[in-house]
Amino acid sequence: MYVVDRGEGAPLILLHGFGVDHRLLLPLDPALAAAGEWRRLYFDLPGHGRSPMGGVASAEDLAEAVEAEIETRVGTEPFAIIGNSFGGMIARRIAHHRRGQVLGLAAIAPVMVAEHAKRRVPERTVIARDLRALAELGDVAGSYEEMAVVQTRENADAFLAHAHPGLTAADPAALERLARRYTLDAEPEIASPAPFTQPTLFVIGRQDHVVGYEDAWDRIEHYPRATFAVVDSAGHNLHLDQPGLVAALISEWLSRVRRSRSSKDRFA
């Protein structure tokens, strides 16, 4: 499995969404690097980017493959995990399965309900549109407009740098196979019903028409240490729509993870 490994310190696993690759999460790296003391491992999920699909045929298979790769790379060392969209669903599963090893969980626009028809989502909304910037995108404009809520030149440039390369690198046959078995065997909060007590962050776009925000809120009592932020003027790629705010929330979450770990070490 292809993984970009940056920095030194406690492992921080980053899992992207469906149909893109690790580059979609690289805009977070300056904030993560500034936080210090974190070894950032950006995964290309099987069938995405530079990772072959291999024998993965379902979301459950993919979660098991990612978990095995984590074990290979970090062993029994405690780690934190960030998941975006589909990667947020996988991150929740891993965080619950490895509770004793996971320092904290951050979910950016996570898939909470796998079946699209059962999700509660707002209507598609565009907050800002720069027609000149859209025209300059050419053939890419269609895929950009599908997700972008703040359609500015800066936002379009971020899409071209971080989202579009993964869209073109993905294996269409692999994605089709995975889409047929997109659900986990059980939702993590049901399979492991005890509250998840490590520092947690849910950050979701108010205008996210892909996963919405209501389904995540339904699980808030399961996460007693969670910050839950619904961000205006932000859609499914909210870290591109509102980069400064999302980076600040991630930085604050990492501070909570660090304090929680230090407290436990002190009283162990």
Residue ranges and their predicted role:
Residues 196, 202-204, 208:
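Short beta-strand/loop motif that positions the catalytic acidic residue
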Residues 92, 96, 102-135:
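Flexible "cap/lid" loop of the alpha/beta hydrolase fold
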Residues 83, 87, 91:
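Gly/Ala-rich beta-loop-alpha elbow adjacent to hydrolase catalytic centers
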Residues 39-82, 248-251:
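Active-site loop/oxyanion-hole signature of alpha/beta-hydrolase fold enzymes
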Residues 234-247:
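Catalytic histidine-centered segment of alpha/beta-hydrolase-like enzymes
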Residues 209-215:
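Conserved alpha/beta-hydrolase "acid-adjacent" motif
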